[in-house]
């Protein structure tokens, strides 16, 4: 599907960028692809990736999604875009809301507009469960990003730039997530700081995140949102699982919820569940393709919103301690940390 094509990954030196590049290299997709453009702000991370991967198919572009010109210049000749650049730390976004808006909303606008201008065939935008019923700035900014993508998709046919969205749960061991924090605290002999023990989160691996984006890329139609069905765990069980894996007896200290945190997350709202298509491992949420001429819908009638629950980390499959340990031990990050323990 990428034969002789050019792919651009915004925020390409982050957790997702590293994961998708590893997949391409291990599966030999890299041999078929014409070029992969890594677009990001951090020259040090680009240099580290350049040295670590040392592949002539990788081209590096310094730039910021906030700057339309840099995005536009990097996108000349690009066939496909994975838009992963974002500010994603919930407390940070609470304190600096305009920074979140500038990157997650206006930056996305720049990426989508440049893709349309440069006649990119397909863009897959990476979103988050926090965009569903958002209560924090990060979730609000990602919800607006989704709305931007869908609004632009609504005005385009399948023969033009196709815009679709993937919505993630918690990606385990991604940069800035709780698993690296707990492991560092365990190895340093510190107390494990738990916000709220009964808080639940979806558990999704970096491998899952790549699978979701590639599935959306292959199957996505104009304005689609794709969600992967994922199990969940309480924060307390996750911490205990890591303690058991590392043979730790560190004390646990409860610190209370941080700025902007929710007790549980939702991946699909009850409103979207009414129109979601169950694809086995995934949900596909088609866009609402109606225009602003509402009069005809009053005459023709409107599909009733189904009385369904939203799909949340509280009502999905809940993993017990042994299941969480088994899942954690499949992660390369945890395996490497165990070797270095």
UniProtKB/Swiss-Prot annotation:
CDD domains named among the record's database cross-references: UDP_invert_4-6DH_SDR_e
Keywords on record: Isomerase, Lipopolysaccharide biosynthesis
One of the GO BP terms on file: lipopolysaccharide biosynthetic process
Enzyme class: isomerase
GO molecular function: UDP-glucose 4-epimerase activity
Entry keyword Isomerase: yes
Record-linked SUPFAM superfamilies: NAD(P)-binding Rossmann-fold domains (SSF51735)
Gene3D superfamilies: NAD(P)-binding Rossmann-like Domain
Family named by the database record: Belongs to the polysaccharide synthase family.
Function as written in the Swiss-Prot or TrEMBL entry: Epimerizes UDP-galactose to UDP-glucose.
Protein name as annotated: UDP-glucose 4-epimerase
Source organism phylogeny: Bacteria, Pseudomonadati, Pseudomonadota, Alphaproteobacteria, Rickettsiales
């Amino acid at each position: 599907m990428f034969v002789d094509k050019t792919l651009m990954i915004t925020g390409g030196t982050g957790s997702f960028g590293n994961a998708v590049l590893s997949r391409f290299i291990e599966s030999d997709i890299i041999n078929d692809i014409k070029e992969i453009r890594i677009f990001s702000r951090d020259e040090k991370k680009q240099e580290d990736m350049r040295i670590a991967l040392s592949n002539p198919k990788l081209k590096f572009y310094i730039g910021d999604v906030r700057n339309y010109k840099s995005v536009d210049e990097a996108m000349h000749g690009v066939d496909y875009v994975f838009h992963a650049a974002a500010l994603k730390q919930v407390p940070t976004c609470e304190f600096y809301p305009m920074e979140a808006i500038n990157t997650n909303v206006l930056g996305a606008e720049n990426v989508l507009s440049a893709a349309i201008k440069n006649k990119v065939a397909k863009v897959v935008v990476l979103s988050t469960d926090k965009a569903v019923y958002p209560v924090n700035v990060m979730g609000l900014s990602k919800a607006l990003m989704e709305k931007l993508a869908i609004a632009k998709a609504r005005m385009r046919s399948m023969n033009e730039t196709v815009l679709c969205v993937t919505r993630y749960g918690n990606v385990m061991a991604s940069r800035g997530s709780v698993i690296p924090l707990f492991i560092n605290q365990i190895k340093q002999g510190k107390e494990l700081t738990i916000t709220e023990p009964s808080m639940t989160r979806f558990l999704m691996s970096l491998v899952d995140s790549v699978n979701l984006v590639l599935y959306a890329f292959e199957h996505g139609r104009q304005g689609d949102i794709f969600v992967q069905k994922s199990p969940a765990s309480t924060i307390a069980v996750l911490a205990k699982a890591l303690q058991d894996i590392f043979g730790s007896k560190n004390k646990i200290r409860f610190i209370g919820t941080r700025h902007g945190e929710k007790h549980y997350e939702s991946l699909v709202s009850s409103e979207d569940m009414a129109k979601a298509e169950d694809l086995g491992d995934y949900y596909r949420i088609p866009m609402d393709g109606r225009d602003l001429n509402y009069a005809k819908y009053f005459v023709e009638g409107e599909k009733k919103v189904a009385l369904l629950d939203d799909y949340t980390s509280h009502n999905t499959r809940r993993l017990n301690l042994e299941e969480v340990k088994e899942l954690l031990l499949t992660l390369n990050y945890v395996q490497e940390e165990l070797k270095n323990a």
